[in-house]
Every structure is written in C-alpha cells, then in structure tokens.
C-alpha cells in the first residue's frame, strides 16, 4: 500500500507522461538523468509519448540540475487532474536561455524557437477533449509570456 500511494521524481520521469510537470523542469534546466548504467542529458532522455531512453534493465537513480540564475514554470492545468494542458519552463543559466514545453504535444520539448519569440504552430500538438491543438499552441505563447515575466520578477 505505501508504494502505491507515493511517487518519486525518478518514477515520474521514467513514465514520461506528456502532461507531467517534471519533464519540463529537467529539459528546461538542462538536467542530467543518472541511471544504474549511465548519465543521459534530459534533452536526450525523453524520446516520445510515455517513452524514454531507458533500457529495460536500467532505472533512474538520480537527477542533477545546474542552478539557474533565473527560472519560472507556468502551467494551464486541467482543473480535474491538475496535470498540465500546457506548461512552460523558462530558465537562464550559464548555457543561456532555455524554454521547455510540456502538455502541448506527445512529449516534452526543448523549444528553441520559443526563445526567439516565434509563434508556435499547432502541427503535431495534442488535440483532445481538454483542448484543441490550436488552443494549446495559443496557450504555449501565453504561458511563455507569464513564465518570462515571473522569471524576470
């Protein structure tokens, strides 16, 4: 019973739910996932909807994050589940500015174009009973602006 009622960051990222918050944190901060066999940059760890770079005989043992100068995460949550319909993490660190988007598509994504303020296209975004792809594309822009404002704070 105790295991069923508790979650971990490692378990959440290994599951890679496309609407989960942690993947955006890892990608947006440029984290490294440590496993029983290797270290995987977060940009390479999340490979598709509910898929990761983990081998069948590997588990997540730790996650290492560089400390950002500034960062903020904003999400538009599903009111029932609190999962992100769209979540955007913005960070500024030694490696520059990074933007990660979760909930909008089948997998968390490093959004290099968002850094430049390019409008997000709805092609390839999720469309379901919670939000259309077009609405999610608009939400990415809105959440990005809010995250930038919060990080600049």
Description of each model-found segment:
Residues 1-153:
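C-terminal structural segment of proteins
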């Amino acid at each position: 019973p105790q295991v069923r009622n508790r979650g971990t960051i490692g378990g959440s990222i290994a599951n890679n739910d496309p609407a989960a918050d942690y993947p955006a944190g890892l990608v947006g901060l440029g984290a490294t996932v440590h496993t029983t066999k290797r270290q995987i940059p977060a940009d390479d760890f999340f490979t598709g909807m509910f898929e990761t770079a983990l081998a069948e005989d590997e588990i997540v043992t730790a996650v290492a994050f560089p400390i950002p100068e500034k960062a903020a995460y904003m999400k538009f949550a599903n009111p029932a589940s609190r999962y992100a319909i769209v979540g955007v993490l913005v960070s500024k660190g030694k490696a520059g500015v990074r933007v990660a988007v979760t909930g909008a598509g089948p997998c968390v994504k490093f959004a290099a174009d968002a850094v430049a303020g390019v409008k997000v296209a709805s092609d390839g975004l999720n469309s379901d009973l919670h939000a259309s792809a077009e609405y999610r594309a608009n939400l990415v822009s809105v959440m990005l602006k809010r995250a930038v404002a919060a990080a600049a704070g």
